[in-house]
A protein has these predicted regions:
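Mature N-terminal segment immediately following signal peptide/propeptide cleavage
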Residues: 25-32
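Disulfide-stabilized, aromatic/cysteine-rich ligand-recognition loop
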Residues: 21-24, 103-104, 108-111, 122, ...
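Active-site microenvironments of metalloenzymes and redox enzymes
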Residues: 48-145, 254-258
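Short, well-ordered junction/capping motifs at the entry into regular secondary structure
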Residues: 99, 154-182
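Hydrophobic helical h-region of N-terminal Sec-dependent signal peptides
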Residues: 9-13
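N-terminal signal peptide c-region/cleavage motif recognized by signal peptidases
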Residues: 16-17
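Bacterial N-terminal signal peptides that target proteins for export
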Residues: 1-8
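Cytochrome P450 core scaffold surrounding the K-helix E-X-X-R motif
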Residues: 37, 192-200
């Protein structure tokens, strides 16, 4: 009888955990967005997908490294992260004052972020998925005042990163119900280096880099006024998979229904 009760309790807890996980994601409907750069002009179609409501927090990442010792600060292989990996944590299993439990985890490499998402049966969002979600306004699929919306984002990009970071849910939720896509941390995407791949395939291998950093003067830009997008592309193009950056976090995604 006790064994049956224990099994039932375990099943109930597992179901509750699954419900919490489900509530932690929102469905982004299929749609399109206009990328700042690409070989083909116009909008890019993005299939429906699910995205975490918030960036992954220090508390969530602590649970991950407790369960997966090889991803702890003192044990991670140099191949998968540089020396900045979780450098602001007090100890391997003690985030400390600079990394509050509800603040977004940062100083994690792309390898670590990808592995964390896989451990949750999720994945990192693609760049197109992230940009599709991030293009939404607060009350509508597109901002009511695009210029003011872009200015607000750019103002955040201009602010220096100070630790400890605020808790997730600090900035604003967009039309899809996703928080903190702007205003808290930069975020890893699965194909973060796609801009570099595109640039390398051109006759002028340095052309893309110059476009990314020349902002409104860039040739081939979909929107010369969207400086914030230029900064995101430049950040992605200058980052390597093992880099751990103080203001770079991540959130997870998974395939959705059409």
């Amino acid at each position: 009888m006790r064994r049956l009760a224990a099994i039932a309790l375990g099943a109930a807890l597992q179901a509750a955990a699954s419900a919490v996980a489900a509530e932690g994601m929102v469905q982004i409907p299929a749609g399109d967005y206009r990328p700042q750069y690409g070989s083909e002009p116009g909008a890019v179609a993005v299939d429906a997908f699910e995205l975490d409501v918030h960036p992954v927090s220090n508390g969530e990442y602590l649970a991950f490294v407790m369960a997966h010792p090889k991803w702890r600060r003192g044990q991670i292989a140099p191949l998968f992260a540089d020396e900045a990996y979780l450098s602001h944590w007090q100890e391997d299993l003690v985030p400390g004052a600079l990394a509050p439990a509800h603040a977004p985890v940062t100083n994690v490499s792309w390898f670590a972020a990808r592995t964390y998402c896989a451990s949750q049966d999720k994945r990192l969002p693609t760049m197109d998925e992230w940009e599709r979600a991030a293009a939404a306004g607060i009350d509508a699929p597109e901002p009511a005042n695009p210029a003011a919306f872009k200015r607000r984002i750019l103002d955040w990009y201009a602010e220096p990163t100070r630790l400890p970071l605020p808790a997730v849910g600090h900035s604003f939720a967009n039309h899809f119900g996703v928080w903190d896509l702007h205003g808290l941390v930069w975020e890893w995407v699965s194909d973060f280096n796609a801009t570099m791949t595109t640039g390398a395939s051109r006759k002028d291998a340095g052309g893309l880099d110059r476009q990314l950093f020349c902002a409104a003067g860039a040739v081939g830009s979909a929107d010369p006024g969207d400086y914030a997008a230029f900064m995101r592309y430049a950040m992605r193009g200058s980052t390597k998979a093992r880099h751990a950056v103080q203001n770079m976090g991540f959130r997870c995604a998974r395939d959705g229904t059409r």
